Design a protein with these regions (language model features):
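One-carbon transfer enzymes
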Residues: 1-226
Length: 226
């Protein structure tokens, strides 16, 4: 049963796997802090729209096709957010820069430690490649061995500036499968291939932590109203 909560919106640009985690949790009724949830897609026909339908989440397309359209996109986004009294925005695979909106908390999920592997240009496979490159350097310097344990992180944080450096809502370590490290170190797979495997592995943890981070962020908003 849903209690009085806030209105939230998820912004996605692609397949929406992270968005699906939040929408699925909302559908089964465990997102108690949310009174309403909407999906905002930046692309017509994006896979996230079908996932919204499957979860019975209302959706809208506010299209943005090129960097020069970003200012107008943000103007239209702000108008939609205000018209629907959205107080929390979850960035879940949005490829465009989102401008701050007054009285709206924005959160993002990052597949690593935001301080070491965050900032502008650090997204997608680039993050995992950097994590793995640093691990290879540690092995090269004989500080650790390929068979040792290594970890990365999943971080849910508030959106702010500098990029990816907003207050952390939750952060958790994720153990990197040993076979990825060993295969990369032996040259069996390339850095790109290793990063793709690590990305797939970490994604499953993102699906756990993004709904939890969304609830924590919504609770923060509700607590301020008391």
């Amino acid at each position: 049963m849903k209690i009085a909560g806030i209105n939230a919106g998820i912004i996605a640009s692609g397949g929406g796997t992270d968005a699906n985690a939040v929408m699925s949790a909302y559908k089964i009724g465990v997102m108690h802090e949310l009174a309403d949830l909407k999906l905002i897609s930046t692309k017509i026909g994006a896979g996230c729209l079908e996932k919204a339908d499957n979860n019975k989440v209302k959706h809208v397309v506010i299209e943005c096709k090129a960097k020069q359209e970003v200012p107008d996109f943000n103007r239209r986004l702000r108008q939609y957010v205000k018209e629907n009294n959205i107080q929390l925005i979850i960035l879940a695979g949005c490829v465009w820069e989102i401008y701050p909106i007054e009285e709206v908390l924005m959160i993002n999920i990052h597949p690593a430690d935001t301080l070491k592997y965050g900032g502008r240009h650090m997204y997608g496979l680039k993050v995992h490649e950097r994590v793995l490159s640093d691990i290879m350097d540690v092995i090269y310097r004989e500080i650790k061995k390929p068979e040792d344990d290594f970890e990365t992180y999943v971080t849910v944080h508030e959106v702010g500036f500098p990029i990816d450096q907003g207050p952390v809502i939750m952060r958790a370590p994720v153990k990197i499968p040993g076979e990825i490290i060993k295969a990369l170190n032996s040259g069996t797979i390339s850095l790109k291939e290793a990063a793709e495997r690590l990305q797939k592995h970490v994604l499953e943890y993102e699906w756990i932590f993004l709904p939890a981070g969304t609830r924590a962020a919504a609770r923060k908003i509700l607590d301020k109203k008391k």
